[in-house]
């Protein structure tokens, strides 16, 4: 039982590391999202300014660039959701492992107490 408790604790440590890595990854992706959104907003403003100056060619160019960025933003949002789902799944597994380890330790303690009483 001691060996399996140690193995479970190693699994728990690895799961926590993996979760931390996913969280760092998703934070990085969220920063990408923020930058993309800022660029999209700038292209919207540039488009409005070009329309006011009646420069349709520039306005069309800005709209095209904005749409390309919007597509990247949509892909980024999908990546964030995918990572968030992985994080949630890992957190559930971590909780399950913590409960299982706790039960195993309690059982070990109970058996040790019985052994002491029996002796």
Where are these regions (language model features)?
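Long, charged alpha-helical scaffolding segments
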Residues: 1-19, 61-119
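Short, charge/polar-rich alpha-helical segments
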Residues: 15-30
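Extended, amphipathic alpha-helical coiled-coil scaffold segments used for oligomerization/tethering
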Residues: 30-77
């Amino acid at each position: 039982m001691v060996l399996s408790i140690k193995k479970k604790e190693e699994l728990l440590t690895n799961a926590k590391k993996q979760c931390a890595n996913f969280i760092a990854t998703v934070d990085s992706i969220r920063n990408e999202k923020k930058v993309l959104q800022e660029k999209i907003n700038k292209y919207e403003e540039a488009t409005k300014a070009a329309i006011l100056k009646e420069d349709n060619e520039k306005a069309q160019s800005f709209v095209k660039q904005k749409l390309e960025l919007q597509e990247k933003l949509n892909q980024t949002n999908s990546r964030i959701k995918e990572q968030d789902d992985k994080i949630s799944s890992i957190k559930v597994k971590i909780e399950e492992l913590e409960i299982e380890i706790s039960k195993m330790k309690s059982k070990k303690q109970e058996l040790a107490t019985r052994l002491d009483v029996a002796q």
